[in-house]
Structures are given as C-alpha cells and as structure tokens.
C-alpha cells in the first residue's frame, strides 16, 4: 500500500512543443507556435512585445496613445463616467457601469476603485488631479493623450466599448498589447499584428535615428517568447484629422513600410564581425589615419632652453652681502 501512487484529479498537461528559440519566424508561424505552446489551464491570450529604439529617460522620446485594432480580443472594462450633474441613474442611458460627479470623486479618495477606466470632461480634471497618488500609480488617471478626457462623452464611450487599446512605452522602450486569444482565428490575429506594426511605424518620432522598431516577440500567457521576422505588413494612411487607418487601395506587397527600409539600410551599413574567419580589411588609408592619431596622442618633447647669462648691475653689486660666521671671527682677530 505504501508503494502505491496517489491518484489526483489534475488535468494532464499538453505536450511541450520543441522549437528553435534563436530562429526568427514569420507572423503566421509565430502565431501558430504561440497557440501550440500555450499550456495554461485557462484560455490564454496572444501577447505582442514591440521593442522600440527610444530613450525613455528623455521626455520627447515617450510614446503613448490609443489604437483600435481590426479585431478586439481584450476584456470588457468597467467604465466610470464623471461629469458635472451626472448621477448613477444616467449610467444605463450612457451604457456604462458607473456615472457621477464630485460625490464619486470623494468615494475614490476613500478607497473605492470598482472600475477599470475613467472617461471624463476637462471640467472635472482639477478635482481628479488631487487623486494622483491613488489613480496615477494604478494607471487609472485620465489623460487627453489616451482619449478618455473629452467633450463628446457619447462618442468616446462608444469607441471604448467597441475596443480601444491603450499603449505606452515602459522604461525599456517596449510596448505590450493583447492581439488575440488562443482559440481565435489565426488570420484575424495576423491582421491585428500587421495593422499594429504599421500603426506604430507611422508614429515614429523625429528625434529617433536609425531603426525605430528593433524587435518583435510573440507569446501566449505563461508561454515562451517567439521571435518574429517582420517581412510583410499592411499599408496605412493618415486622414485629414491625423488618424491612422488601413489603406485598402494600396498594395501592401508592392510597398515597403518605412521601418523595413530602415532595417535593410542598417544591415548594409553593419560593420564586419571580429570573427577570425571574416577579419576586417585594413587599407593603407586607414593605416595613415591611425599613424596621425598616434602622433597627436604622444606629447612632443620640449627643446632644451639655454640659460641666459646673469647680468650683474654695478649699482646693486656694491651692497654688502650678509656675512658668514667664519668671516665675523676673522674680523675680530684682525682688530686685536
């Protein structure tokens, strides 16, 4: 009896899928791998991580905003609407979970946080700004860049209910976002990724030099990261109001997006590796430059300066110099 194994009711784990983690996969291959490597007991999401060439310590190199993907797979958020004159009775007509004015702001200050998103008007921001320690640390503070500070509440509420994803670079310049679910159609997830990459590429900052999108990784919840080779993407265009939308009239395969062209240019300018099989070529011009640099680096020896002969002024020479002890004794003996 002691040697018998205990019988448990745990569900068996899915067999692990072996794949080369150093290899770059196409978007479609990466999505399929992310689905296969999902071993969670719950319905896992497909997450994307986009590494951008940004120095987030600088205020002009931070990216944040909202994007509406072709297919929304996120969670339904509990929405709180704040405006002067609103009450909880108005929540049903607006189609949100909670609605109110200064009374609800007072409840938040006491610790009430039964919501995931705040949509408000500019008039309420002075009161909300006092709750920075409560809302700011949880990422709930409304911001005009995120689109949840507006004068048109019905329109903004409708957009967020359809599915608007907020994005913001972290301290390392990464953007994380859910682009699908493990049971979703692969084609829909691929379309979301293509649109998101083109959208981010269109948001390139003028202060950035070189490649803007450096790396793209895909993974399922609690799954391994999969490197993505971005070789094809949808083409986007900007409307008169500056909104980025998909350009169905353009042929995506014939037009390369900006970040792909930069990637090719960077690969051409890449320096040769220091591997012994591929040694760097040293030309005569480089040798001459090195010699010049070495000459400048060595300090030149100072030429010996000949000492000038000391000219004795006759007027100053007549002054008596201080007598030595031996001279004083000789003077005393001579007087005797």
From Swiss-Prot:
It comes from the Bacteria. Transmembrane segments: none annotated. Residues 267-336 are annotated as: Disordered. Residues 1-245 are annotated as: Large ribosomal subunit protein uL1. One of its GO terms (cellular component) is large ribosomal subunit. Keywords: Repressor, Ribonucleoprotein, Ribosomal protein, RNA-binding, rRNA-binding, Translation regulation, tRNA-binding. Residues 246-336 are annotated as: Unknown. Residues 306-315 have a biased composition (Low complexity). InterPro entries: Ribosom_uL1_bac-type, Ribosomal_uL1-like, Ribosomal_uL1/biogenesis, Ribosomal_uL1_3-a/b-sand, Ribosomal_uL1_CS. GO terms for molecular function: rRNA binding; structural constituent of ribosome; tRNA binding. PROSITE patterns: RIBOSOMAL_L1. Residues 286-305 have a biased composition (Basic residues). Part of the 50S ribosomal subunit. This is Large ribosomal subunit protein uL1. The lineage of its organism: Bacteria, Bacillati, Mycoplasmatota, Mycoplasmoidales, Mycoplasmoidaceae.
